[in-house]
Amino acid sequence: CVRGALYAGLRFFAGYPITPSTEVAELLSEELPHVGGRFIQMEDEISSLCAVCAASVAGDKAMTATSGPGFSLMQEALGYAIMGEIPCVVTSVQRGGPSTGLPTKVAQGDVNQARWGVHGDHAIIVLTASSVQDVFAMTVEGFNMAETYRTPVILLFDEVVGHMRERLDMPEPGELPVVERLRTSVKAGVNYYPYLPREDGRLPMSDFGGVHRYNVTGLYHDIWGFPTEQPETVNKLLYHLVDKIEAKAAEIARWKEYFLDDAQQVFVSYGSAARSALHLVHTHGCSAAFARFVVEPRDVPCPVSEHRECFLGKGRYHQLALLTL
């Protein structure tokens, strides 16, 4: 995760130690100063994501890392980032819950929280991984998607993946695409509309505190960023926030498929559980698929929908199934 974030251009991290994600903060506290970045240990998870939002609007690629209880505390600031269209990355390494739960044990019970934890109607992008190589690739993709769609992106890993030790084939600089911040071409002294999308739907940014003065708020706002309750403006913004992701669902969503030809039964999984599931169905001669990227967007045809039986894991309460079928 750390190597992927640095490859993608991370320059600011704010966080609070919590098992099993603390290693992300520990390593970034050592590595960020070497690339001119900043690391801050905040007083809690609430202030951590707020600091990340501030760093992002000021022009830096920014992220935080947490788990279970800390992720719960971040939900309000996550909603602020959605409403303010602030690109950032939130890494959540899942552990047993609820409450303090099982801090050192693996779990995959935060799927619904990642998708629906923020109150109100919204869309969000969530990426998962099943290996160290996947973690690197998905972290780079997470930053790219955050910048492309001007939205927070959640990296939803689990404790086993978070503490996994595997070989990582590091790509050379430039080998993987890295999306840089789209900055406005509007010059100083000219009217700048921070929330007026271009014809292609993308929204250029101006570094906060720079040559343009504008407002950033968690309230519904107009193209200048000032709060409004005007129904037409509110409705237009809501549809924009959702459609900019869901309309691109086919470009965003991806999965890996294994042995699906003529399959009658399909197992769908993600994270560390996907590796075990794949091994079991392979050794028993069945067919399997697992989603490396799940949760959102939803409006994408599921590759398992054509098959008669579909088994989804992990978790007694079938959180993944609710979002897949």
Model-flagged regions — what are they?
Residues 105-159, 179-185:
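Conserved thiamine diphosphate
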Residues 11-15, 62-66, 125-130, 264-269, ...:
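Short glycine-rich or small-residue beta-strand-to-loop segments that form or flank ligand, phosphate
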Residues 1-116, 118-120, 123, 159, ...:
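Thiamine diphosphate
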Residues 24-27, 51-54, 74-78, 99-106, ...:
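Short acidic, glycine/serine/threonine-rich loops at helix termini
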Residues 69-70, 95-96, 131-133, 160-162, ...:
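Short, glycine-/Ser/Thr-/acidic-enriched flexible segments
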Residues 50, 64, 90-91, 155, ...:
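Structural beta-sheet core signal
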Residues 153-256:
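Conformationally flexible catalytic loops at phosphate/diphosphate-handling active centers
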